[in-house]
A protein has these predicted regions:
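Extended, low-polarity transmembrane helix blocks
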Residues: 1-34, 45-60, 66-124
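Flexible, solvent-exposed coil segments and beta strand-coil junctions
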Residues: 40-44
Length: 124
């Protein structure tokens, strides 16, 4: 694990993995129903199945990244998850309230930063 990585690379990779693990566990255990209802309201077919698949993708990718196993595959999995989750949950253009719209734009920008970090991980 982590052969030929600088200490800073290890810290960065572990922080990225921790972000995905923490949100994946939190959302799976305490926010599952809320996310499922939002997806149903958006017309996502088979919302429960899609949500379970998304959480599996998120948690598996984060675990692979934390263990530095198949790092490039993990980065691609998490990248795909991040893009799909952003398209489903951060549809800022549909939100009339300026404050809530701003929060969704901010979350989308954070997700873009995560994608940048994943791209760097894949390039190591």
């Amino acid at each position: 694990m982590y052969e030929k990585h600088s200490a800073l690379q290890v810290v960065g990779q572990l922080l990225l993995a921790a972000a995905y693990l923490a949100t994946g566990i939190r959302n799976t255990l305490w926010k599952f129903g809320q996310h499922e209802e939002r997806m149903k309201a958006l017309g996502i077919p088979q919302a429960r199945t899609v949500l379970v698949a998304g959480f599996i993708l998120q948690l598996a990718g984060a675990a692979l990244l934390a263990l530095d196993y198949q790092r490039v595959v993990a980065a691609w999995l998490l990248g795909a998850f991040t893009i799909l989750a952003s398209l489903i949950f951060h549809r800022w253009w549909l939100i009339p309230d300026p404050l809530i719209r701003h929060l969704h734009i901010s979350n989308l920008l954070v997700n873009l930063g995560l994608l940048g970090g994943l791209a760097l991980i894949a390039a190591i």
